[in-house]
Amino acid sequence: MTLSSDMSDVLAEETDIDVVGEDDEPRAEEEEDEDLHGDLLPTSPQSSATKDPYKGTGGGGGRSALVKPPYSYIALITMAILQSPKKRLTLSEICEFISNRFPYYREKFPAWQNSIRHNLSLNDCFVKIPREPGNPGKGNYWTLDPESADMFDNGSFLRRRKRFKRQQAPELVLREPGHFLPASAYSYGPYSCAYGIQLQPFHPHSALIAFQQQQQQARQQPPSLPPMAAPALMPPAAQDLSRTCTFYPHQLSPAALPPSLQSKSSSALARSTFSIESIIGGDLNPGQCNSPKAAGVPVISRALVTFSSSQAAAALGGTLQPGTVLTNH
C-alpha cells in the first residue's frame, strides 16, 4: 500500500511538470519567494517538510497560469473589426471583443485600453468613421483601410509584413489636382459656396502648369496693333468728329494738353453744339456753346449716335462741307 501511494505521488509530480512546462530558473525564483514569505510568517515543521513549490500557490495558481496572447495590439484590433458584421466597431466594442476572447486581457482590463486607443489613432491602417446623426451612442467607429488587406503575412495575425502607410500615387496627384482638398473647403453647408457656385480647386502643380501654359500662349500670339482710322477716306467734318470721339475717352481734361493741342481741340469744340449738359438734359443756346467758358467743357460726340441716317450718308459720301453744323433731331 505504501509503495503504490508513493509511486502515484511521483507520477503526479512528473505530470504537473510536463503540463506547466517550467524550467529550473522559475522554480528557483519561487523557492526564493517562499523563503522570503517563510521569514515573515511562522510555519509548522510538518508544513515546511511537505511543502511543494507548485502546490503552494494554490490560491493564485489560476491567475498566474494566464498567458499573454502572442498577438500585437494591431492584430487584436484587426480581429475584432473583421468579426463584426458591418466591419466597424467603436473603442468600447473592440475592448469588449478582446476581453471576451482572451482571459488574460479580461483580467488586466482596463490597463490596456489606452494602448488600444493609441494604436487606433497612430496607425494608418485604421480609419475613423464619424457616427451618424440619427445613431445615438458615444464614440466614433473604426474600420480597416481597404489597402491594408495584405498587411499580415499569409493571413496570419502572428506576423506582420511591414508598417502600413497610406500614400497617394503620383499619377493621381497630377490627374486630380484637387484630390487632397476636402469638399468642406469649397462649401458652406448643404448649399455649397454662394449657393451653387463652385470654386476651382487649387493645387501647386495645377497652378504651375497653368502659368507655363499662359507663357507659351503669350509667346505664340503676335502682339495686336491698335486700330487706326484712314483719314483719306473720310471728309474733313467726319475727321473732326472722329478725332473728338477717339480722343476724349482717354483724356477728358483738355486743360492737361499741350498748348498746340489745346488750340485744335478748342476749334473742334467750337464747331460742335453738343456738350455734357445737353446729354444730361440741360438746354444751352448757341451763344453759350460758342463762348470760351463752354469751349472748356469736355464734349462727347453724341452726333455719331443720334444724327439721322441721311446726314450720315451725306457725311460718308463727301457732300458735307467743312464747317457744317450737325443738328440733333
Curated annotation (Swiss-Prot):
<keyword id="KW-0524">Neurogenesis</keyword>
<dbReference type="GO" id="GO:0000122">
    <property type="term" value="P:negative regulation of transcription by RNA polymerase II"/>
</dbReference>
<dbReference type="GO" id="GO:0045892">
    <property type="term" value="P:negative regulation of DNA-templated transcription"/>
</dbReference>
<keyword id="KW-0678">Repressor</keyword>
<dbReference type="InterPro" id="IPR036388">
    <property type="entry name" value="WH-like_DNA-bd_sf"/>
</dbReference>
<dbReference type="GO" id="GO:0030336">
    <property type="term" value="P:negative regulation of cell migration"/>
</dbReference>
<dbReference type="InterPro" id="IPR001766">
    <property type="entry name" value="Fork_head_dom"/>
</dbReference>
<keyword id="KW-0221">Differentiation</keyword>
<dbReference type="InterPro" id="IPR030456">
    <property type="entry name" value="TF_fork_head_CS_2"/>
</dbReference>
<feature type="compositionally biased region" description="Acidic residues">
    <location>
        <begin position="11"/>
        <end position="36"/>
    </location>
</feature>
<keyword id="KW-0217">Developmental protein</keyword>
<dbReference type="InterPro" id="IPR018122">
    <property type="entry name" value="TF_fork_head_CS_1"/>
</dbReference>
<dbReference type="GO" id="GO:0007399">
    <property type="term" value="P:nervous system development"/>
</dbReference>
<dbReference type="GO" id="GO:0007498">
    <property type="term" value="P:mesoderm development"/>
</dbReference>
<comment type="function">
    <text>Transcriptional repressor that down-regulates bmp4 signaling in both mesoderm and ectoderm. Regulates mesoderm patterning by repressing ventral mesoderm genes and promoting the expression of dorsolateral genes. Can also neuralize ectodermal cells directly. Inhibits neural crest migration. The transcription factors foxd1 and foxg1 mutually repress each other to pattern the forebrain.</text>
</comment>
<dbReference type="GO" id="GO:0005634">
    <property type="term" value="C:nucleus"/>
</dbReference>
<dbReference type="GO" id="GO:0001755">
    <property type="term" value="P:neural crest cell migration"/>
</dbReference>
<feature type="region of interest" description="Disordered">
    <location>
        <begin position="1"/>
        <end position="63"/>
    </location>
</feature>
<keyword id="KW-0804">Transcription</keyword>
<dbReference type="Pfam" id="PF00250">
    <property type="entry name" value="Forkhead"/>
</dbReference>
<keyword id="KW-0539">Nucleus</keyword>
<protein>
    <recommendedName>
        <fullName>Forkhead box protein D1</fullName>
    </recommendedName>
</protein>
<feature type="DNA-binding region" description="Fork-head">
    <location>
        <begin position="68"/>
        <end position="162"/>
    </location>
</feature>
<dbReference type="GO" id="GO:0030900">
    <property type="term" value="P:forebrain development"/>
</dbReference>
<dbReference type="GO" id="GO:0007398">
    <property type="term" value="P:ectoderm development"/>
</dbReference>
<dbReference type="GO" id="GO:0003700">
    <property type="term" value="F:DNA-binding transcription factor activity"/>
</dbReference>
<dbReference type="GO" id="GO:0043565">
    <property type="term" value="F:sequence-specific DNA binding"/>
</dbReference>
<keyword id="KW-0805">Transcription regulation</keyword>
<dbReference type="InterPro" id="IPR050211">
    <property type="entry name" value="FOX_domain-containing"/>
</dbReference>
<dbReference type="InterPro" id="IPR036390">
    <property type="entry name" value="WH_DNA-bd_sf"/>
</dbReference>
<keyword id="KW-0238">DNA-binding</keyword>
